[in-house]
Swiss-Prot record:
Transport recorded as keyword: yes
Membrane topology: Peripheral membrane protein
Annotated family: Belongs to the V-ATPase V0D/AC39 subunit family.
Phylogenetic placement of the source organism: Eukaryota, Fungi, Dikarya, Ascomycota, Saccharomycotina
Subcellular localization(s) per the UniProt record: Vacuole membrane
Protein name per UniProt: V-type proton ATPase subunit d
Organism: Saccharomyces cerevisiae (strain ATCC 204508 / S288c)
Gene3D superfamilies for this protein: ATP synthase (C/AC39) subunit, domain 3, V-type ATP synthase subunit C domain
The keyword Cytoplasm belongs to this UniProt entry's keyword annotation: no
Amino acid sequence: MEGVYFNIDNGFIEGVVRGYRNGLLSNNQYINLTQCDTLEDLKLQLSSTDYGNFLSSVSSESLTTSLIQEYASSKLYHEFNYIRDQSSGSTRKFMDYITYGYMIDNVALMITGTIHDRDKGEILQRCHPLGWFDTLPTLSVATDLESLYETVLVDTPLAPYFKNCFDTAEELDDMNIEIIRNKLYKAYLEDFYNFVTEEIPEPAKECMQTLLGFEADRRSINIALNSLQSSDIDPDLKSDLLPNIGKLYPLATFHLAQAQDFEGVRAALANVYEYRGFLETGNLEDHFYQLEMELCRDAFTQQFAISTVWAWMKSKEQEVRNITWIAECIAQNQRERINNYISVY
């Protein structure tokens, strides 16, 4: 019966998203891409997929890896915004929550660029389109966190996430900006998790709790590893940065905060089945991407669930990374590495 009510508000959206999912590149299509000799061949192969003639305005002479990435990403943003424009109520709020993470990245990027005297226009070009907000360009005038909040961020959706940041930064330097960014992400993920738990019905609720829990775990592991290089981050500060959700929470999260070396981090993960072998072999980011894609693929097995929006979005982002990787290998004639992409569909 919940399917009947779901379809009243969200049936069209889920249908569109599942159509997008069916347009994701298959293993056979990836194999065809890896056999291309030039970027022009790659463009031709992509034209027979859902990407169609998205590069038709780009001449062979000006075709580059960065242009392919830019145009593929632009297609993703257009499709996401189309879905968001069709949504309302809690589904619209859910779509908005997805964009908050990109907003946090944009804020950190703008502040970092400003303190290093980078060109404002250049920084704005690097900002993520889905994380754009009206006052973003004015971030470059802020000299400290308080003025940043009062003049720019107080009217944005990120404002509630700043309440635990003001005791962190006396001045805005690279270290403090990264600490602020991680605190914002922690508050954001926990808030998103609570929203999903309270507002989103099953089966989407369980799917999103799993996906957000994974996102929190990935951040926790990366923070634990990166903090090993800094003597300024003690266990108490580290605890303030690690999200209180996910498979790692609470026991492994506590041990990650206490870890002083690589062995300590590995020991903290040893009792968590999903991440047990992540630090043993291969590239850590590749392990994360692989697991994320498997979770997203599984999310599509559920019907009447807006969690498919998140699963499609993350799958599409991985697809853009894959295409960019293949294009870069072709451009640099690194044929032996061209198959190091991640595909689960």
